[in-house]
Amino acid sequence: MCDDDVAALVVDNGSGMCKAGFAGDDAPRAVFPSIVGRPRHQGVMVGMGQKDSYVGDEAQSKRGILTLKYPIEHGIITNWDDMEKIWHHTFYNELRVAPEEHPVLLTEAPLNPKANREKMTQIMFETFNSPAMYVAIQAVLSLYASGRTTGIVLDSGDGVSHTVPIYEGYALPHAILRLDLAGRDLTDYLMKILTERGYSFTTTAEREIVRDIKEKLCYVALDFEQEMATAAASTSLEKSYELPDGQVITIGNERFRCPEALFQPSFLGMESCGIHETVYNSIMKCDVDIRKDLYANTVMSGGTTMYPGIADRMQKEITALAPSTIKIKIIAPPERKYSVWIGGSILASLSTFQQMWISKEEYDESGPGIVHRKCF
């Protein structure tokens, strides 16, 4: 299977970034934003080869004249036409492969509507003529990537966060919790609190600038109240950021107020539990005998877990919730941004996985519903 001409393709379609590459590789070959941009203005110059839509990095670089749309919201594909464009771009422009020659492993968030994966299956077989495909749960792949068979994964990306407890390779579906609070909500929140400082960010293109500020300057405070006091008393926490037009803005307590919303969703006006409580609640829904193993193997994955300080804060918060004698270990591998993709690469190249693929023949025989029988 490791031979490049029949290597399986692994495509992790995140709400924010699409990660794609070949099974057996240790990192995705293509990582680009899951965006489709359409011009906001009329084209006037003939022969410029203007397109009616742009995908990924090209959309990002021309964002000043485009309206950018994300076809995946909260981990669910909401715009199938745009999603097809992204897949088309992935196969033909990024990986430069013929999709009808390679099996494809796709990923999705747990507790997604069933129709979502049926439609994914249908498009892969009918539009792209894939020989075989499989849909895997994102958090399960992250656990593969960390080399464990038992643990609880907190996977937090751009659109959705979820906690999935897995014991000896079995996911425990009754204890899976999903939180529709993730990176994109934090970007929106940062846009809002920067407005209070007098910086106005409103368009879809400016939102991308704010996302960059968030990724470069934000961090999670170990003690929020104390950090707020420090920020108020001195300028030691202030950092400056240069906008594309050369203007320099300064941000202070926004740096940690933004990701704090992960632990206090009330900042966003949401009535849900923070990520630490979600992990705890998920563990408490599991059998009493396996909780100890889950506390000791709490794996973080996804781009929204990349903030400096998040693992220490998580350790502190869960220690406060859990019984005092229990050992708590938060595993935050440095490559966790891509651990879903890496897990997919591992899974698709296992010899034992080869009989798990849904083949074109099986699809033709049973229709899209087969995906629920063959994929967890």
Curated annotation (Swiss-Prot):
Modified residue annotations for N-acetylaspartate: 3
An example molecular function term from Gene Ontology annotations: hydrolase activity
Post-translation changes: Oxidation of Met-45 to form methionine sulfoxide promotes actin filament depolymerization. Methionine sulfoxide is produced stereospecifically, but it is not known whether the (S)-S-oxide or the (R)-S-oxide is produced.
Propeptide feature: residues: 1-2
Origin: domain of life: Eukaryota
EC number: 3.6.4.-
Residues that bear Methionine sulfoxide: 45, 48
Cellular compartments annotated: Cytoplasm, Cytoskeleton
Pfam assignment, any one: Actin
Sorted UniProt keywords: Acetylation, ATP-binding, Cytoplasm, Cytoskeleton, Hydrolase, Muscle protein, Nucleotide-binding, Oxidation
Keyword Membrane assigned: no
GO cellular component: cytoplasm; cytoskeleton
InterPro entries: Actin, Actin/actin-like_CS, Actin_CS, ATPase_NBD
Reported function: Actins are highly conserved proteins that are involved in various types of cell motility and are ubiquitously expressed in all eukaryotic cells.
Family note: Belongs to the actin family.
Protein name: Actin, muscle
Organism: Manduca sexta
